[in-house]
């Protein structure tokens, strides 16, 4: 466990990873540590065969190939660290093949579905309704990651604290502490203005930590949790007549990108707005558009034979 703590400290100090990324590394490492303990194995004396058995164990427990790949990558990095610190001289994962998986196309909502969702939310005039309406408008207008959305600070979006004027353009720190520019539209601004009127309903003045956040709560972090927002979003989808199983904060982010591309936005611009380090990550949305075109062609008279 001591080596795991040292590795996590190194990640935090040298790679500038986000808190969520560090937690993901920690979970993978602790799961691996627990597996070794059950098998009565030492992390400094395991073999490639031991690792293959571990990978088989993960697959047998219905873990998806993508998740297994992430765990392998985490443990491989961990052993590279152990080697660099002279704790061992062998990386047992060097000859481990990554399981293959199909790169599933992201799920998106249609523009009509988005309109139905926003229409339902705009009808709820309670403070909770105003908050959810603002969060959904902001997420769909900006393509923010849900972790970025919930942790926004009041100062991030206000150009004037006294008049509470909302900025149209602001910046966020994304993955790897990389700053990027966010631009939002008038409907999102209007929803935020309405929400700010009732925001104090959610402020717990006995916990000063939550005062600085746009969406404050009594949660330990001081702002609404990702999980709570996802639950509220699915509930709103149900009342809006949508299937809650097909909606999540990430689906709204995907919908933002796909609808921009459909409207003629440049792929490089979408990459910047989403905060993707690699254009290949953004290119998946072009495959979505290709699928839509193929479906549209099915309505051609010569396609019906």
Curated annotation (Swiss-Prot):
Signal sequence, renumbered to the chain: none
Q: Where is the active site?
A: 145, 175, 250, 253, 276, 285
A Pfam family hit:
Phage_integrase
The record's section on PROSITE patterns has:
CB, TYR_RECOMBINASE
Q: Which residues form the Core-binding (CB) domain?
A: 1-83
| Top-level division of the source organism's lineage | Bacteria
Q: List membrane-spanning regions.
A: none
- Occurrences of domain Tyr recombinase (ranges): 104-298
User: Which proteins does it associate with, and in what oligomeric form?
Assistant: Forms a cyclic heterotetrameric complex composed of two molecules of XerC and two molecules of XerD.
> What's the protein here called?
Tyrosine recombinase XerD
InterPro entries referenced in this protein's UniProt entry, alphabetically: CB (IPR044068), DNA_brk_join_enz (IPR011010), Integrase-like_cat_sf (IPR013762), Integrase_catalytic (IPR002104), Integrase_recombinase_N (IPR010998), Integrase_SAM-like_N (IPR004107), Recomb_XerD (IPR011932), Tyrosine_recombinase_XerC/XerD (IPR023009)
User: What GO biological process terms are annotated to this protein in UniProt?
Assistant: cell division; chromosome segregation; DNA transposition
Q: Which Gene3D superfamilies match?
A: 1.10.150.130, Intergrase catalytic core
Q: Mention any one GO cellular component term assigned to this protein in its UniProt record.
A: cytoplasm
Q: What does this protein do?
A: Site-specific tyrosine recombinase, which acts by catalyzing the cutting and rejoining of the recombining DNA molecules. The XerC-XerD complex is essential to convert dimers of the bacterial chromosome into monomers to permit their segregation at cell division. It also contributes to the segregational stability of plasmids.
- Which family does this protein fall into? Belongs to the 'phage' integrase family. XerD subfamily.
Subcellular location per UniProt equals: Cytoplasm
